[in-house]
Structures are given as C-alpha cells and as structure tokens.
C-alpha cells in the first residue's frame, strides 16, 4: 500500500477543499491514487448532500462583485445564519461571485463553470462544502449587469464581511459623465432600492398578472359603485400603484419631494453628460423561501431519543 504522506493529503485538500480527515480517508481507500481519491470524495459528498437536500435553506449570504464595467450579484443559501460567519462558506460565496463576472451571470452558467484554482465545477465545490460543513446549501440565483460607459454602483445591507450581507443591490448608470459623481449617485440609488424594494424599473416591467391582481383588489374594495366609477377608481389606483413599486416613479428616499427620474435628470448637469439608469438588481436573503417553523424543545428531545 502506498504511504499516505502529509504532502499527499495537502495536495488532495488543495484540489478539492475537503477536510483533512476526509482527504486522508479517501487516499487510504484508494491506495494513494489522487484522481481516484477525488472521485471517492465526490461520491461521498453527493451522498451527504442528497441526505440534506430536503432541508430548507433560507439563510446564508448575498454577495456583490464588480470589475470595470461589469458587476454581478449572487445568493447562496444555507440552513442557519451561523454558516454566514464561516470563513469557508464566505470564501465560496466570494469566489462564486467572481465566477459570475466571467460568465453570462445566470445561475446555471455559474454552477457549471470551473471553481477558481480547482479542477471541479462550482456546483461540485458546493457539494464538497455541504459535506464539510454539514448543512444543506444552494446556489439560488445570480445576475450580471454591464454598461458600455458609466458605472455600476453597489450596496450591501447587513454586511457580514466586505461585499457580503443580507441584501445586495447593483445599479447600472450609463453615462460619459464624471465617474466619481456617478458613483456617489449610484450608491444613493442603490441604498434607495435596498430600502424601498421596487418591483421594476418602470411600468413596462410590471407583469400583466400583477396589474390584474392589483386591479381586482381595488375593484373588490369598491363593490356596489357604478361601473364607470369603479373604472376610474381602478385607473387612478393603478397609477398610484406604479408610483409605489416602479423605481423611476418612486419618491427618492433621500429627498421625498422628487422622484428618482427627476433626481437622475437633475444629476445630468452635475456629472456633465446625459445619464440613463439602465437596470438594477436587488437580492434579499431568503426572499420568497418558506421557512419551516421548528419546535426547538421537541427537536432536542427527538435528537436525544436517537442517541
């Protein structure tokens, strides 16, 4: 049998990110064959991940990463908020965000891409991390923005480490104007988006289903009134709804007397060039994930009964 040296264990750990004891076990089981040990670890990781796959993962981190005229945001979920403080988890999230910058930014492309510095994909690296940390984790979503000129500003709310927290926002400002002033404005708008959570840039981005649902709610409130009156109420109500949920029509959080579109128009004079907000991304951790209600006392009792 081949000698399992510390150097061999370190080499396997560097390639896979698996724990030292798992690496030693893998090498022992495969008689020191690195490639076979990698396969052994993958199978073990897949088995562990499969056991945890049904568990709700609504905690974790949202991260933003930027480079020049490109920026990306991702959300990686875990079961508990303790994992967000884990350096290995944070490192994975950071590297996955960098991968998003070098792909088309979709979560499928990120998952399939090679993990930086390793021979495995991002998805395979996450599987190994699940086996190491012991919680279910998911690469939930990813997005990428770009500008031909201008800036992509970012903001992270509830930051745990730099660029990673509970809410991540990107804002694309297309302009040939002063970059420093654009960056300041972009960050203010990013903070606005984090606070007010617009559904879309403007009315054209609101789905017909959402509009129909809002109209139905308005009509239900005014049942019994003449049809023409109901129609006017619904029309007025939808306009008010757009002002509440579309970014360009919202009252600017830093100056409620102006809409975001007015702020952008006025800023053109300050930056010295035409200015257009072309897109934004807002990821809030666990948004839309139904969390399980757990009875802690019952959970402890059940665990004690199994031991």
UniProtKB/Swiss-Prot annotation:
GO cellular component: cytoplasm
CDD domains associated with the record: UBA_EF-Ts (cd14275)
Region (Involved in Mg(2+) ion dislocation from EF-Tu): 80-83
Disulfide bonds: none
Any GO MF annotation of the entry: translation elongation factor activity
Chief site of localization: cytoplasm
SUPFAM superfamilies: Elongation factor Ts (EF-Ts), dimerisation domain (SSF54713), UBA-like (SSF46934)
UniProt record similarity statement: Belongs to the EF-Ts family.
Summary of the function given for this chain in its UniProt record: Associates with the EF-Tu.GDP complex and induces the exchange of GDP to GTP. It remains bound to the aminoacyl-tRNA.EF-Tu.GTP complex up to the GTP hydrolysis stage on the ribosome.
HAMAP family cross-referenced by the UniProt entry: EF_Ts
PANTHER family: ELONGATION FACTOR TS, ELONGATION FACTOR TS, MITOCHONDRIAL
Protein name: Elongation factor Ts
Organism: Xanthobacter autotrophicus (strain ATCC BAA-1158 / Py2)
Taxonomic path: Bacteria, Pseudomonadati, Pseudomonadota, Alphaproteobacteria, Hyphomicrobiales
